[in-house]
Amino acid sequence: MKNVSRIIIFIVAALMCLGTASCMKDTTIQYYNKTMGNVNGSTFVSDQGNIFHVVEQEGTVYEELLKTERAYILCDVLNKTVGGQDNEYDIKLSAMVKVLTKDIITLETEKTEEMVKEDPVNVKNIWLSGGYMNFYIEFPIKKGSETPHLINLIQQETTEGYLFKFTHNAYGETMEAYPNDEFDIAGGYISFPINTVVKENEANLRVEWTWYKTYGVITSTETEIKGIEGTYKKDGFEHMPKTQTQKTMAVIR
């Protein structure tokens, strides 16, 4: 009888555990969702068109988000917003990185020597989303310097499609001007609204920039023109790269 009683107690306990687990079932839609988008009032609208309401946060990251216009965020998508649209969700915001936004300098814009300077800049990634051409960039800065480097995307004359030059004014803080051990690497995210320039539903794009030549793992102080080209589609969407997490430094303007 003692064995029977023990078995019955075990079964009851197991059923209670199952019941508790069922009641505490995790309804989170997606963990560790990374996306880029714009802050709209108290909400975040991703480049995919999803509307996110922050109902939980880590620390004071939501307050930091509200101080920006565009950001890259890390969040858990908890559930669909009650009474909301099909693309409306409640999220737990874990982290955010500010994204600098600037207008493209068009053919009609009067240019200055300052804005067209072509100091080396390493364009790590380019992608199109939400009507923006987005970049993740890196460049050397002199250790301890607070000089903001100037970044621009400048439209160029071309006979076919669209050609843009990604420019960087380092204000003298280049690798050839100082020994390598006097530099840190800075950078981050920057977005340019592409729909303000490209009006077609589909068009060929090319972006060029200047960076240092590399020989294996050795970076030279010689420079070269690098570039990438592809097809722009007005309603297209490209997911942002998942590898970069470095914050956009205050040394970019």
State where each predicted segment sits:
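C-terminal motif of bacterial Sec signal peptides marking the signal peptidase cleavage site
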Residues: 18-22
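Bacterial signal peptide processing site
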Residues: 24-27
